[in-house]
A protein has these predicted regions:
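Glycine-rich, often acidic-flanked micro-motifs
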Residues: 2-34, 66, 86, 93-95, ...
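Extreme N-terminal, non-catalytic leader segments
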Residues: 45-102
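Walker A/P-loop nucleotide-binding motif
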Residues: 110
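Post-Walker A alpha-helix
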Residues: 117-118
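Core catalytic alpha/beta fold that binds nucleotide/phospho-ligands
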Residues: 30-37, 48-50, 54
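Acidic-aromatic/histidine active-site loop/patch
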Residues: 2, 39-43
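Conserved glycine(s) of the Walker
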Residues: 113
């Protein structure tokens, strides 16, 4: 039998540079959130989140095979996404790779290969050169003025890739499988539907929906979006690297 004993713990976190309070009812949520405990300690949380029994039931209706600890994690993530929209933050389903101080998002439907492509970057560019900021659901801050910023968060996907950090978002690459590698830059009109598919949009919250649309509109004017067909060869790394970074790919820098 799975251990689902409740023990509530209130955690003051800093997520996407916003102080929030998250109450954990089960140990799983507390464990994944610990790296994000607010070390400054002087900022009052802007809001508090706790998953109710009704929230767990909502998640269970979509995924009945999972335990309460896992469902709580999903419910709290959903609640944060709902609240973050009004603070110019969105959840962007992607694998976010940091390289040379900038973040690059690889987006695709689940199972298409975004994690595989990120792994290729780490393999061919070296662990010290490319690392995953968040492997599944990074937060993006898209302010009214200035650069969009990608943030790590506790929800890191099945690979568990990620860390508490941030970097300016310098490019988005939407992947699809293909026998040969090719890439093209999309204009905002051509990219908007692809980008919206990767964003969490608040449920039954018109103001939150409008806030997400505003973030996406600003994102598309500031961050280049690429559509790439790729395989799993080193040529895939070369193709995306040169387009996204604007620099020549010099070959594998990993330790032989």
């Amino acid at each position: 039998m799975r251990n689902e004993q409740e023990h509530e713990t209130a955690l003051k976190l800093r997520l996407a540079d916003i102080p929030v309070q998250v109450t954990s009812r089960y140990g799983m949520l507390e464990k994944i959130c610990l790296p994000y405990v607010d070390g400054r300690g002087d900022a009052e949380p802007l809001f508090a989140v706790r998953a109710s029994d009704a929230d767990l039931d909502f998640e269970r209706a979509m995924a009945p095979e999972f335990s309460n600890p896992y469902l709580e994690s999903c419910a709290v993530h959903r609640a944060l996404a709902e609240r973050f929209a009004s603070h110019e933050r969105i959840v962007f389903h992607s694998c976010m790779v940091e390289y040379a101080g900038r973040a690059y998002a690889f987006a695709a439907p689940s199972g298409t290969g975004k994690s595989t492509h990120a792994r290729l970057w780490m393999q061919h560019l070296g662990d010290a050169g490319a690392k995953v900021l968040n492997g599944d659901k990074p937060f993006l801050h898209v302010p009214q003025e200035g650069a969009a910023v990608a943030y790590g968060c506790p929800w890191t996907g099945k690979e568990g890739w990620g860390y508490n950090g941030s970097a300016p978002l310098a490019g988005i690459c939407v992947l699809h499988q293909a026998p040969t590698c090719s890439i093209e830059r999309l204009d905002p009109a051509g990219a908007v539907e692809l980008i919206m598919r990767q964003c969490y949009v608040p449920r039954e919250n018109p103001a939150g929906t409008l806030a997400v649309l505003g973030c996406v509109d600003r994102l598309l004017t500031r961050v280049p979006v690429w559509s790439m067909g790729c395989d799993i060869s080193e040529d895939a790394v070369r193709t995306s690297f040169e387009a996204l970074t604007g620099t020549e790919y010099a070959g594998c820098s990993c330790n032989k």
